[in-house]
Amino acid sequence: IDLDRFDIRTKISEDIYYFANDMENVSSIFSYFFLKKYYITDYKIQKNHGFKLHSKIRTFDEIKSPPFENEWGWYSTDIPPYYWLKDCKKEEFLCIVRDIYNNKFIFSSDYQQIFDNVNVINEKINNFIALHIRGGDIVYSSLRKHAGRKVLEERFFPYEIALEIIKRHTNANVKIIIFGQDVKSNMKLLNYIIENKILPKNKIFTVDEFINQTFNIFERTFFEMNLMSHALKIYTPGIQAQKSAFSQCAMMIAGRKNIISYHEIFSLKQQYQIIKSNLGLLGLDSLYDSMAYFQLYKLSRILNLTLDLSLNYIKKAMELDQDNDAWGIHYIYCCFLLGDLEAIETFLKVLLDSNKLNNLLQTFIISKSMRIYKEQEDCFISFRSTKIYPMINYVGIWLNYHYGEFVRMYKMYKNYQKYFNDLEVDTQCFFSCYQKKDLISNSAVLIVKNHLSYKLGKILLECKNLKDFVEIPIIIKYFLWESKNEKAYFKSFLFEIEKLDDYNQSCSIRNYLSYQLGKLIIESFKGWYKGYLLLLPYRAFILYRKIKKDKR
């Protein structure tokens, strides 16, 4: 449900049969007595991942006594308390949660019936391991464009890895049940196992073989989670504490540690070899194969394999998912590493000519301040070359502008201004007060970065050579003029910076050396008649030493 903004929807067609997340009415799930005692309807309690609660090791007394995160208490977290709560013993915690969950008064009659049916089915199956395969929620939604976001990469469970786990259980005296929302892909895995005589049909199943087909999506989910809890082992994606919340919930229902991540079984080198060997065997949707090639690309970089090999993998990923601009970003990055600037320039020009460049640019900033593509962006943001690459510089200008690095943006623009006319790209938008207002109005960080103090400090700190020093008066003159114009234009607009989500982050920017140095310069010019300008070099040196000391 927390990923609903990524348009993860149920998809049923000739080729795809995938169930997305869904939520049932609370009164349909829980009993009247349970809701009366525990249900909170206060609209002031917003969605929250509980990051603050598990941000440090705490004690029982600490979380029971004020000050709390909010006046009413704490937001809960999906990270189990034995990771962050002192003296919380794992085995004891799991047993307590299991006993609470098994209370007959929690669920409505319909859901209690599902709960009871699961117990009957489990007795018939007897001794099974579960493969909890996640992937459809990523490959069938815009999440696949967030390929750099660690938590999403950790949630993905490649079918190629699942196949290998099954192969390693051929001689085990247990049954295997394949769990997951992608019904068709699960069936393809099952059929491959049976047709290739890896396991007989009475040894391996998909969870759909046990599900009442009249269930709605949430009832299916409830059934799956409860059946999964009975598994001897649950193979899941995820690293360390950040495993799938679905699998972890099944573990808590079980009251024992029965989940194991495939990362704990296979080294990165083994994962690379397994995906490479099994890719294409199951006849999965091309989006899965594209993701598998991206996994090979990512692993090849971690394992320090050749750049040419990495480039080949990301090209194959692009061929199979042509709408995924995340792959384009990684292709460009690989070309940067290879020093093939001509290939990057050509690729960007093709996107421009086909009106697809903006899609790539928006994918760069898709995670906003999290900057999941920071490593790739930095190649553009700090780009310097003696040769002429207008497209690369245009992307650098665009990124600097959208991240509030207006000084760097202006300098890149001045150096390449005469080349942009031939490209037919709009560069005037970077100098429009109207466009600037729209850019910064929803970000406290960008508002602060647009302060003259920050920009003046950046002008001095970003001087890298003699040419930069010579241009200082010209650049300062421009930003003084810009500041005057924007001050007049923004006068009629109210920026309620304290109410913006990134306000706390913006406060830290005010303490940056660049901001403090710019502020000192402005104060010195305002107090020139008191001799402040003469003291400026000394005061700047003292400021530098103070900030450097504070960083330690």
Where in the sequence are the language-model features?
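A donor-sugar binding/catalytic signature common to diverse glycosyltransferases
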Residues: I1, T221-Q270
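Secretory-pathway glycan-assembly enzymes, especially type II membrane glycosyltransferases
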Residues: I1-L143
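Active-site donor-nucleotide binding/catalytic segment of nucleotide-sugar enzymes
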Residues: F128-E160, I177-K184, K298
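Catalytic donor nucleotide-activated moiety binding site of glycosyltransferases and closely related
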Residues: H132-R134, L163-I217
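Leloir-type glycosyltransferase catalytic cores
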Residues: F266-D340, I366-K368
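Alpha-helical repeat scaffolds
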Residues: L307-E319, E342-N355, Q376-Y389, R408-Q417
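Boundary/linker segments of alpha-helical solenoid repeat arrays
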Residues: D323-I329, D353-S367, F406, F420-F431
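Boundary detector for helix-to-coil junctions that initiate low-complexity/charged tails
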Residues: K387-R552
